Structure formats: C-alpha cells, structure tokens
Amino acid sequence: MSLKGKSAIITGGSRGIGRAIAIMLAKEGVDVAFTYVKSSIEAENLKSEIEKQGVQSLALQIDVRDFDKTKELVEKTKLAFGQLDILVNNAGITKDMALMFMTKDDWQSVIDTNLNGLFNVTRNAIVTFLKQKSGNIVNITSISGITGMARQTNYASSKAGIIGFTKSLAKETAAYNIRVNAVAPGFIETDMVSSLKEEYKNELKKVIPLGRFGTAEEVANTTRFLLSDESNFITGQTIVVDGGLSIR
C-alpha cells in the first residue's frame, strides 16, 4: 500500500483501535510514534511489538490536552525519525450519563480530550505538513457523532465536532497536497465495549445488520487504506465502520 519508509504519530496508541493501527502501520514499514496516558507496561509492550516489524518506534507519555506537550510530540517524532508524514488522531475518552446528571467537568473533560486534544496535535503537525506540501491525517470519530446516542451528549458532541473539523481542514489544505479524512467506528471489540453487560451486548448485536461487533483490526484496515496512495483522490470524508448499524 506504498507506506514503507514513512513516519506516523498515533495518539492514544497503546491499546484498542490505536494499538491495532500502530501494529498494522508498522507491518507496512512505517516508523511509529504513539502517545499513552497511564500504562507504561502496555506502552513498552507495543513499542516492542512495533520494533519486531523492523521499524523504529517512539512511546511518549503525553496528555493531548496540553498544547505545549503536543508541540514536543511533533518535534520529538521528527527528531527521532527525520520526518513526519502521517497523523492519526485516536485519543479519546467517554463519560456516559444522562444530561441531567452530567456535571460541567463531565462535559468539559470529554470535550477537552476528544476535540481540543485533536486540535492541539493537528495544529502543531499541520505546520510541518504545510511546509513540506504533503501529509495525511485520519481522525477517529464515532457513529455517535453521526446518529447521536442517548447518554452521550458530551461524547457525541465531541465526535460530531471532529467530523466538521475534518471537512473544514480538508478544504483548507487540499491545495498543499494534504489529505484529511475520518473513520467512524460503531461497536468495536475493545475495553469500552467489553465493559458492557452481556445482555446489553446481545441486544446490540441484534440491531447490527452484520450481527456482530467489529474488531480493532477492521478499523485499522480502513485507516490504512485512507493513509495509502490507493485513496489519493479521497479527502474530507468520513468512512463508517459499523456493520451497517447506522444505515438509514
């Protein structure tokens, strides 16, 4: 898929979808820098897994809500790999509850991580992409940002914002050979879904036309396609990976 020799930043890369994307890109010959927040053990395990593919890896414990730290992320990646070609904005959190019980902090913390964090990283990376007149960005959003979900006003708002951000930045940077797209997963077999009650998971599967949850690797496959030359004429789009759940 013509990715060999490129370098990437993946935020929220140490587990779930981010981890799957990191490993898949490494297998394509991409040097991978990724961020994590808590588990240094998970981060070191992923770093080792990436390096087994014969590429370089950089694990950085960074809070994407901190603008200056995300600037350091870009600088350290370029220093380690000599270049930056790809950005995957995957870092995100949830604090699901009915709006009437949601505190200002419950709202703000989700917006700060999911949307403001994405701005911070992209704002610092875009300078490099504009100077070199090339770059590829994939933002991980959610079907919650497309269809809305009960008890997710904070999360859905942040993810809908990512879709608007993606479209606007794609229009803004297309003339500089920069592509910006988004991937919107549905229910994927990650820690977030695994924590749901079994009876609720069974009910969810009944309303998914393909009858199952997706895998992190399936989301990674879509991301890899959008980062490859095979999607060179695609920008500003949101690709849904949800087993048909959002079909209307």
Spans of features found by a protein language model:
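Conserved glycine-rich Rossmann-like NAD(P)H-binding loop of the short-chain dehydrogenase/reductase
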Residues: E28-N45
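Alpha-helical segment proximal to the catalytic Tyr-Lys
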Residues: V127, K171-A175, N232
